[in-house]
Design a protein with these regions (language model features):
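Pyridoxal 5′-phosphate
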Residues: 92-96, 150, 256
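Acidic-histidine catalytic/liganding microenvironments
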Residues: 11, 76-77, 329
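Glycine-rich FAD cofactor-binding loop and adjacent beta-loop-alpha segment at the N-terminus
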Residues: 1-25
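FAD/FMN-dependent oxidoreductases across multiple families
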Residues: 186-270, 276-278
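C-terminal helical "tail/cap" subdomain of flavin- and related membrane-associated enzymes
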Residues: 265-342
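Conserved N-terminal helical subregion
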Residues: 20-125, 133-138
Length: 342
């Protein structure tokens, strides 16, 4: 999103992205089953700050972001790396938090920040409860080249039995994200490249022309997680350790950036005043602010997923009605667009 870009620029990360790895999202559409109707989100002429914009958002490969983030902090004298290590124990007391690594080293500090995935070991060990949602679905991710242009338009296709997200990279290269029943995933994984590409082409009515698989296929089970609170004594959760989203809204990474932005601002202000950065009041303030960001979006997304993955006749009618109503309500579309553009 545009706010996420601003955060990454402020951290000196965005500037390190190769220009050809930053892909622009010009529009987005949502489709339901085999209906020709689509909910369309064009690029607004300006954001909420009345600044001119020409894109809904940006697509940048994960490995590019990780590499740029690593490069951006090289040379910082106040940073110490412990690469290739794993946390095997952690605890906190009135004055500090400590972690023990798998090589026996112990590290202590005023505040422990956990960013160790939605399956966070630190979250569990520190006694922070989390609500976990097993979707019973797998996600397959791969890239397809295609004959006709994608017009830099993302499409979220809620078919009956599976969901297909098409994320435009270049005009003739698209990242595909297939979500389907975990029991059916092996069938797609067993397909050769040509068969898989033809399968996707047929699903979208051949509107991209001939398609060709140009990457490996990555597969993982889909689990959503939301911690009931984002802190405990001298420990705070950020990123997926705090909230692991369903990918349908593509907001997981954006929420992760927001979490570190909120927490880091509070820490910098506290440190600037010479006060304890592990103060419970600071951590409670972080929890309140980030819960407001994540909780409505997490549960709202899960409700949308539940509706658009049910195959009953009544659900199919309701799905179509929801899209029609959304198209007819400009304020709702504006609210969704504003989440992307700021």
């Amino acid at each position: 999103t545009h706010p996420s870009k601003a955060i990454l620029e402020n951290l000196g990360i965005w500037q390190r992205f190769p220009a050809d790895e930053v892909h622009y999202l010009r529009a987005a559409s949502v489709l339901n089953g085999d209906s020709p109707f689509r909910l369309h989100f064009p690029v607004p002429t300006q954001n909420s700050h009345r600044q001119a914009i020409d894109t809904l958002g940006y697509l940048v490969p994960n490995h590019i972001i990780r590499r740029a983030a690593y490069e951006a902090v090289q040379g910082q004298e106040n940073l110490r790396w412990h690469t290739g290590r794993r946390v095997v124990a952690c605890q906190s007391d009135a004055g500090s938090a400590q972690v023990t690594l798998d090589n026996g080293d112990t590290i202590s500090g005023k505040l422990l920040v956990a960013a160790d995935s939605r399956f966070s070991f630190i979250r569990r060990t520190m006694g922070i409860a989390a609500d976990t949602h097993e979707f019973g679905r797998n996600v397959l991710v791969f890239r397809l080249e295609h004959e006709l242009s994608n017009d830099h338009t993302a499409s979220e296709c809620f078919f009956y039995g599976s969901t297909l997200a098409l994320l435009p990279l270049t005009d003739h290269l698209t990242n595909c994200v297939v979500t389907l029943d975990s029991r059916k995933a092996p069938e797609l994984l067993a397909m050769d490249g040509e068969t898989l590409a033809n399968h996707i082409a047929a699903q979208v009515g051949h509107r991209y022309g001939a398609m060709k698989l140009v990457s490996s296929v990555h597969d993982y089970p889909l689990v959503g997680v939301h911690a009931r609170r984002f802190y405990t004594n001298r420990c705070a959760l950020i990123g997926d350790a705090a909230c692991g989203m369903h990918p349908v809204t593509a907001h997981g990474y954006n929420l992760g950036l927001q979490s570190q932005e909120i927490l880091s601002r509070l820490i910098l202000r506290q440190a600037g005043q010479g006060r304890d950065i592990g103060d419970p009041a600071l951590l409670a303030a972080y929890d309140r602010r980030h819960q407001l960001n994540t909780r409505p979006l997490y549960h709202g997304t899960n409700a949308i997923v539940k509706l658009f993955t049910r195959e009953t006749p009544s659900a199919k009618i309701l799905r179509h009605g929801v899209l029609r109503l959304s198209q007819a309500l400009p304020p709702l579309k504006h609210l969704i667009t504003r989440q992307l553009t700021g």
